[in-house]
C-alpha cells in the first residue's frame, strides 16, 4: 500500500498527534479580502472571532472525546478547510504507518479472529479429550483388574473372568515347573483337585487342569435343597395347625368341615358345656354340647365372687379372680387347659356392658351382651329395697302397718299358730275390697274385730324375735 499523502485542502488528525496549531496560523496568515459593504465589516469580524474562540474551546474537546471513543480502531479523522467539521478519512493507522481502510480488511480481520477462536476451541477440546481418555483408560484398567481376580493353587495361578464362570490358568514362563529340568525330565505338576470351592461357588476341573469351570449342577442342587427346605417348612406348619383345636367344633359341637377336610383337631373331650343343662332346661337327648361338668369348661360362679354362694355342690368354678382381669381366650373357645389354676375370668358376657349397660365396640364386640337380663336385673334391684322394707316392717312391729292401712281382717277358720307361723298369709289383706264386700256390716262386728286385733297385737309384741330379724 502507498503511504497517505496529506491533502492540500484538508488537514489530517490522528489520535496520538499533539494539539494542532496549523489551522489557526493559516487563518491568521490568510488575507481576507473585504468584499462586503463597509458598514457590515464589524459584524463579519465579530462573527469570525467568535467562531475561532468556539473552535479553540469547544471543538477541541469534542474532537478529543470522539477520538477516545474510537481508540480501538485508530480511526483517522480529517478536518475541513475552515476547521468546523470532522469526517472519517477511511484510513487506518497500523504500526505508525497510515493504511487506507476498506471493507475487505475488516472482513479479513473478522475471519482471522474467528479462525483463531476456532483453533483455540479445537485445541482445548483435544486437550480435554486427551485427559478424559487417560482417565477412562485408568478407570478401565482398574475395573479390569477388579474384574479379573487371580487365585493361586500350589504353584499354579488361575485368573477368573468377569462372569465368574471359568478359571483360566496363567502361563508362567519363569516358573521352574513350566520348563524341563537340567536332566531333561519335566518337573511334575502340582496336584489340582477335581472340585474347588471358592466362596459359595464350586468349580470343576476339565482336562489337564488348565481351565476350571463353574459346576452347572450346583444351581440344580441349590434349587433342590430350597425345594426340600420349603416342603419341610410346610409340613411343620401343617403339624402345628393340627395341634390346634377347631374353634367351631369346640364351641358349638359341630363343624362344617367335619368330613376330614378341617386342618384342626376335633376332640370331643374339649367341647364346651351346655348352658341349658346347667340351668336344668336341656331336655335334648342328642345335644351336641357336653353335659359333663369339669373346671376347664365351667364359667365363674358370680355368687361365689360376691361371697354369697353356700352350695357345696355348685357346678360353677369357685376361684378368686381379680375384677379387672381379662377374659380367658381358651374359655371363650370352649376349653381352658389351666382349669382352676387360670387367673382370668371365665365368662361369656361383656364386663363393660354388664357394668355400664353399653359397650364402646358395639356390634364389633365378640362377647355376649345380655340385653334382657340387664333389664331384668335393673328391675329386680329397684324392687329389692321395697321388699326388704316390707319384711322388716312386717316382722318388727305391726303398729306401722295398722297406722298406714285399714284394720286387718282375719279368717275365722285360721288359728293363731297358723297366722304367726306365716302359713296362711294368703288370707291376710291390706286393702278395703274384702272388708267392704263382707257379709256383716254391723258396727258391733267391727268393734269385736278391733278388740280382737288389739289383743293379738299385744300377744305378738311379746313373742316377736326382733333381734334375729334385724
Swiss-Prot record:
Enzyme Commission number: 3.1.-.-
A GO molecular function assigned to this protein is: nuclease activity
Could you tell me which residues belong to the region Disordered? 122-144, 370-389
Against PROSITE patterns, the record matches this protein to: ZF_C3H1
The annotated consequence of residue 343 to T reads: No effect on RNA-binding and ribonuclease activities
User: Which portions of the chain have biased composition (kind: Polar residues)?
Assistant: 131-142
The listed outcome for residue 365 to S is: Loss of RNA binding and reduction of ribonuclease activity
Q: Mutating residue 263 to T: what's the consequence? A: Loss of RNA binding and reduction of ribonuclease activity
Q: Where is the composition biased (Basic residues)?
A: 370-381
> Outcome of residue 262 to S?
Loss of RNA binding and reduction of ribonuclease activity
Q: What PANTHER family does the record tag this protein with?
A: CCCH ZINGC FINGER (PTHR46156), ZINC FINGER CCCH DOMAIN-CONTAINING PROTEIN 3 (PTHR46156:SF1)
What does the function comment of this entry state? Possesses RNA-binding and ribonuclease activities in vitro.
Please identify the protein, giving its name as recorded.
Answer: Zinc finger CCCH domain-containing protein 7
Q: Which species?
A: Arabidopsis thaliana (Mouse-ear cress)
Its taxonomic path starts at: Eukaryota, Viridiplantae, Streptophyta, Embryophyta, Tracheophyta
Amino acid at each position: 500500500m502507498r503511504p497517505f499523502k496529506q491533502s492540500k485542502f484538508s488537514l489530517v488528525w490522528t489520535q496520538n498527534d499533539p494539539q494542532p496549531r496549523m489551522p489557526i496560523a493559516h487563518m491568521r496568515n490568510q488575507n481576507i479580502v473585504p468584499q462586503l459593504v463597509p458598514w457590515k465589516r464589524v459584524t463579519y469580524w465579530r462573527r469570525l472571532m467568535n467562531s475561532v474562540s468556539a473552535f479553540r474551546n469547544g471543538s477541541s474537546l469534542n474532537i478529543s472525546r470522539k477520538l477516545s471513543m474510537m481508540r480501538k480502531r485508530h480511526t483517522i479523522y480529517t478536518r475541513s478547510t475552515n476547521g468546523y467539521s470532522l469526517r472519517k478519512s477511511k484510513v487506518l493507522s497500523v504500526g505508525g504507518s497510515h493504511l487506507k481502510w476498506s471493507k475487505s480488511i475488516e472482513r479479513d480481520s473478522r475471519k482471522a479472529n474467528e479462525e483463531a477462536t476456532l483453533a483455540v476451541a479445537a485445541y482445548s477440546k483435544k486437550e480435554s479429550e486427551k485427559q478424559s481418555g487417560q482417565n477412562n483408560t485408568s478407570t478401565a484398567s482398574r475395573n479390569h483388574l477388579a474384574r479379573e481376580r487371580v487365585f493361586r493353587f500350589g504353584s499354579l495361578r488361575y485368573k477368573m473372568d468377569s462372569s465368574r464362570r471359568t478359571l483360566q490358568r496363567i502361563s508362567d514362563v519363569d516358573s521352574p515347573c513350566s520348563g524341563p529340568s537340567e536332566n531333561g525330565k519335566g518337573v511334575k505338576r502340582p496336584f489340582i483337585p477335581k472340585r474347588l470351592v471358592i466362596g459359595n461357588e464350586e468349580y470343576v476341573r476339565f482336562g489337564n487342569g488348565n481351565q476350571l469351570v463353574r459346576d452347572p449342577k450346583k444351581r440344580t442342587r441349590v434349587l433342590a435343597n430350597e425345594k426340600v427346605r420349603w416342603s419341610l417348612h410346610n409340613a411343620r406348619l401343617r403339624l402345628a395347625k393340627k395341634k390346634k383345636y377347631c374353634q367351631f367344633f369346640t364351641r358349638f359341637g359341630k363343624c362344617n368341615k367335619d368330613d376330614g377336610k378341617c386342618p384342626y383337631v376335633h376332640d370331643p373331650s374339649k367341647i364346651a358345656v351346655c348352658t341349658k343343662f346347667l340351668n336344668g332346661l336341656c331336655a335334648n337327648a342328642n345335644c351336641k354340647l357336653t353335659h359333663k361338668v369339669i373346671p376347664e369348661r365351667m364359667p365363674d360362679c358370680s355368687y361365689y365372687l360376691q361371697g354369697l354362694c353356700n352350695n357345696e355342690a355348685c357346678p360353677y368354678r369357685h376361684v378368686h379372680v381379680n375384677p379387672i382381669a381379662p377374659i380367658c381366650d381358651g374359655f371363650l373357645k370352649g376349653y381352658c387347659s389351666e382349669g382352676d389354676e387360670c387367673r382370668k375370668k371365665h365368662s361369656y358376657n361383656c364386663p363393660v356392658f354388664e357394668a355400664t349397660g353399653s359397650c364402646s365396640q358395639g356390634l364389633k364386640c365378640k362377647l355376649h351382651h345380655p340385653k334382657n337380663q340387664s333389664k331384668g336385673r335393673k328391675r329386680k334391684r329397684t324392687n329389692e329395697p321395697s321388699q326388704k322394707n316390707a319384711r322388716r316392717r312386717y316382722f318388727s312391729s305391726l303398729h306401722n302397718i295398722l297406722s298406714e292401712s285399714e284394720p286387718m281382717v282375719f279368717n275365722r277358720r285360721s288359728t293363731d299358730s297358723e297366722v304367726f307361723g306365716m302359713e296362711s298369709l294368703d288370707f291376710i289383706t291390706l286393702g278395703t275390697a274384702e272388708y267392704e264386700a263382707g257379709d256383716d256390716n254391723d258396727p258391733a262386728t267391727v268393734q269385736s274385730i278391733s278388740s280382737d286385733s288389739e289383743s293379738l297385737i299385744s300377744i305378738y309384741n311379746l313373742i316377736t324375735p326382733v333381734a334375729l330379724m334385724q
